Amino acid sequence: MKQRDHLQRRLAQSQPMIRWVEQQVSARKLPSMLAFLPLIESSYRLDVVSTAGAAGPWQLMPDTATRFSIPMMPSFDGRYSLPLATDAALSYLSWLHQFFGQDWLLALAAYNAGEGRVLKAVLNAGTRNLWELQLPTETRLYVARFIALAQLLDRAEQHQLTLPPWQAGENIQVAMHPGSCSLLQWAMTKGVAMNEASRWNPAWQLPDAPGITNCPIVYSRGGSPAPTHQNSKAVFRKAVSLESLHDPLLLQAARGLDMSRGKIKLDALQDPLGLDTRRPPLLP
């Protein structure tokens, strides 16, 4: 199964970032599963941009970045910064959640299609049931893929999915660099090779970013200690506890989750992560 192999690779390769983002999600008391949304958006790659202009791990459009005060300059594009993009994306998702009456399905749809389009669809349809709204197929499948991902993670054994130990991979930290944002200066001060510094910080289009101050710099603190004998799957599942999602993403009987009425059934989705679906390519 190509999708399963791809997901396993991306989970393993993205584990350091997933752990860090989950901490930010938890600090905001948001559903833990949101830490995996960049898997749908960008396969958790920091350095990608779509032909539509969305960039970074959270695929933020320029207007959204501006709205949440992310700097975008020739020398520095904060949409590629894991800390800056995560802060903006979670702020946006939190706002959407409140705007749509604490409905996560509508919030996710609006993250993909824009709140204006989703609000118009709700008003026109006279219902908040996502699957009854006139929305682009891409948006409906976007939400369905996220629900499918939640199910895949929750039922890994059933789908022959091998989950990596939660503490696998490198440990990343974020340091605030006071004053002018010079990745080169930081790397020289810390004795870090520039290519290693750039690997975690693709927001820097140039080694220095004049006009940008107090920027977050991501760095690796090396690998994790050897895993204990504790069941790694249990550790992973606990860390992304789907219980925190309540009804919105568990496909239990709840308002707005009658997917059959919207003629979208997860069982019929042969490509839950959208790997074979035509959409704007991600460019390095």
Each model region followed by its residue ranges:
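Extracytoplasmic and endomembrane cell-envelope/extracellular-matrix remodeling and assembly machinery
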Residues: 1-23, 27-28, 72-75, 79-99, ...
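Alpha-helical scaffolds flanking conserved acidic
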Residues: 31-38, 55, 103-109
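Generic alpha-helical secondary structure signal
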Residues: 16, 32, 59-63, 67, ...
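Short, surface-exposed glycine/acidic/tryptophan-bearing loops
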Residues: 47-69
